[in-house]
Regions:
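Terminal, non-globular segments
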Residues: 1-199
Length: 199
């Protein structure tokens, strides 16, 4: 039983890494509004590097952030903290963001959810969605606040708001795909994790 659960966990970790590689590769492609290296004349490098081609283009939702939060609500044992921190740190570097800042914010948010896994198990999707919206808002505000304090350049506020709204709207879709395509669900009462411990 334990070996089967460990195998299942490994499969989901590899699935997460595969999706992360795919999404990151897509974000680095020179596609209008969705990747690095494309934008209207005069677009500043920061907006382009973060997937923002300009005010007339839609920024890409943070799919991997949605995936991390959705999986953390359902099966926190599948995403160890080093995996989350490592991926988002690499993403910071590849997308030319301040290294470590967004990774730390994401890690804090996911560990917040991990510490409340027992309570989250009883949440319906409506309550879960409200919690995630509040958490996403806190994350984006914290990121902008820290960048403002250290006087680091950051994306236009309008683009950040569009990015936030896109991520909020993408969350239910990510949850649906995780449930129907990947078979990811909240554990039943009394179900144990890969170490034989109750959730």
């Amino acid at each position: 039983m334990v070996e089967r659960r460990q195998t299942q966990r490994l499969i989901y970790v590899l699935l997460f890494l595969g999706l992360a590689a795919l999404v990151t590769f897509y974000r680095l492609l020179p596609l209008g509004g969705y990747g690095v290296g494309h934008g209207p004349a005069g677009a500043d490098d920061l907006n382009v590097a973060n997937g923002y081609a300009g005010l007339t283009s839609l920024p890409m939702p943070d799919i991997l952030l949605c995936l991390s939060l959705a999986w953390m609500v359902r099966r926190p044992d599948l995403l160890p903290a080093p995996l989350i921190a490592g991926y988002f740190l690499l993403e910071d570097i590849l997308l030319l963001r301040p290294p470590g800042l967004w990774a730390l914010i994401v890690l804090t948010a996911t560990e917040f959810l991990r510490s409340r896994r027992t309570q989250l198990r009883g949440y319906g999707f409506g309550l879960e969605y409200l919690l995630i919206i509040g958490l996403l808002l806190a994350m984006f505000l914290a990121n902008r606040a820290v960048l403002a304090i250290v006087m680091a350049p950051q994306a236009h506020l309008g683009l950040s708001l569009m990015h936030f709204l896109g991520t909020v709207l993408a969350y239910p879709l990510v949850v649906a795909v995780s449930h129907f395509a990947f078979g990811l669900r909240k554990p039943a009462t009394g179900e144990v994790d890969s170490l034989g411990q109750k959730y």
